[in-house]
């Protein structure tokens, strides 16, 4: 990492000015959550937050300054209304007052798959100059919430972040922070990136990862495992297009296998999205099974089902990723922010055991070197 200045040094702002790409359910939960936790007591443990105050930044210090989408029902609309329109169907946790942030038309590129095309109407407004929009909004952090499979679009916005000198949080499974070429681009530009592919607070990936490690730590040979996921949001509808989902399967699989020493045959591990069930709305149901052998090679099997609201589950992690990116920007750090990426993302540049990644993140928060 490059040399840096301590957070809170002269020139570091008291706000975290955030722009969002993709005003879907995840963006909705994040925007609502900032409102929900405005008055959270930073001297107490607050349900739903790992850190009320992350370094110098309270949750309420996050301010939304720009948003980009391609949906005709969202472009030209105040962010506070856009998060509740079109196909967004996550649970409502807060009323959001007008933000005075109007959703702008971003470029489409490969951001819309065939199921999106059949479901939403694309805005006929010409795309804006994203770099100029980020600069004019004095953006600190750009969060990419593009649909799974948006390889070209995600890299376009990553380059915009570099050009605008804006920190980048890559919430989807397009490999940017974990790609050495892209990592060097961010490092050379002294622009921080936290990525790739956001973990949930307690989701299928983190629970599966922990249980696989538990088997290993307790001397149980994990022979085979699977994770099947169904949900009712646009993310799951989009992932019915299997050509768009390969990076997601890779990301979820390596998040589990990287936490154990065992090498799996391809047929012995299956992890990925399975189907779209419309009436689930933004809920996700995960079915996980681990099959192993314990003492005397006696079979030992574990099967569980996890039910979550998908988008709030990720918002509880992205709120820390955003503030970590801002601290890195304050300190002049360029390139992947390893402590935040390793703990908060499924496919970071460096996979670490969760307890080590968490300890490094806490050290990063208080680091004043």
Swiss-Prot record:
Signal peptide extent: none
> Which SUPFAM superfamilies does the record cross-reference, listed alphabetically?
Glyceraldehyde-3-phosphate dehydrogenase-like, C-terminal domain, NAD(P)-binding Rossmann-fold domains
Gene3D superfamilies annotated for this entry?
Answer: Dihydrodipicolinate Reductase, domain 2 (3.30.360.10), NAD(P)-binding Rossmann-like Domain (3.40.50.720)
Q: Which Pfam families match?
A: Inos-1-P_synth
Q: Name one GO molecular function term.
A: inositol-3-phosphate synthase activity
Q: Which GO terms describe its biological process?
A: inositol biosynthetic process; phospholipid biosynthetic process
Q: Which NCBIfam families match?
A: mycothiol_INO1
Recorded family membership: Belongs to the myo-inositol 1-phosphate synthase family.
Q: What is this protein called?
A: Uncharacterized protein ML0396/ML2692
Q: Whose protein is this, by species?
A: Mycobacterium leprae (strain TN)
């Amino acid at each position: 990492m490059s040399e840096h200045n301590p957070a809170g040094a002269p020139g570091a702002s008291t706000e975290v000015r955030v722009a969002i790409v993709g005003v879907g359910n995840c963006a909705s939960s994040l925007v609502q959550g900032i409102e929900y936790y405005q008055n959270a007591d930073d001297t107490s443990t607050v349900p739903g937050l790992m850190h009320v105050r992350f370094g110098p930044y309270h949750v309420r210090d996050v301010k939304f300054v720009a948003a980009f989408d391609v949906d005709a029902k969202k472009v030209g609309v105040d962010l506070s209304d856009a998060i509740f329109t079109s196909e967004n169907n996550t649970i409502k946790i807060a009323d959001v007052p007008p933000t005075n942030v109007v959703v702008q038309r971003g470029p489409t590129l490969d951001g819309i798959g065939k199921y999106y095309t059949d479901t939403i109407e694309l805005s006929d407004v010409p795309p804006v100059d994203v770099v100029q929009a980020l600069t004019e909004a004095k953006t600190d952090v750009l969060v990419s919430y593009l649909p799974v499979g948006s390889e070209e679009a995600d890299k376009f916005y990553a380059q915009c972040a570099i050009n605008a000198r804006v920190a980048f949080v890559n919430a989807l499974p397009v490999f940017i922070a974990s790609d050495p070429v892209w990592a060097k681009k961010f490092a050379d530009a002294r622009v921080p990136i936290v990525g790739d592919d956001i973990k949930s607070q307690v989701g299928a990936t983190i629970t599966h990862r922990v249980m696989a490690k538990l088997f290993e730590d307790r001397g149980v040979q994990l022979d085979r495992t699977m994770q099947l996921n169904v949900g009712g949001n646009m993310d799951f509808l989009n992932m019915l297009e299997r050509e768009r989902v390969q990076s997601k399967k890779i990301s979820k699989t390596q998040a589990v296998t990287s936490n154990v020493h065992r090498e799996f045959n391809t047929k012995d591990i299956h992890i990925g999205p399975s189907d779209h069930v419309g009436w689930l709305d933004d809920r996700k149901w995960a079915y996980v099974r681990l099959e192993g052998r314990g003492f005397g090679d006696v079979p030992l099997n574990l099967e569980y089902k996890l039910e979550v609201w998908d988008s709030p589950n990720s918002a509880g992690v992205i709120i820390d990723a955003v503030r970590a990116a801002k601290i890195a920007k304050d300190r002049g750090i360029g390139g992947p922010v390893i402590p935040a990426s390793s703990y908060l993302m499924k496919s970071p540049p460096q996979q670490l055991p969760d307890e080590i990644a968490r300890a490094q993140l806490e050290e990063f928060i208080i680091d004043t070197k």
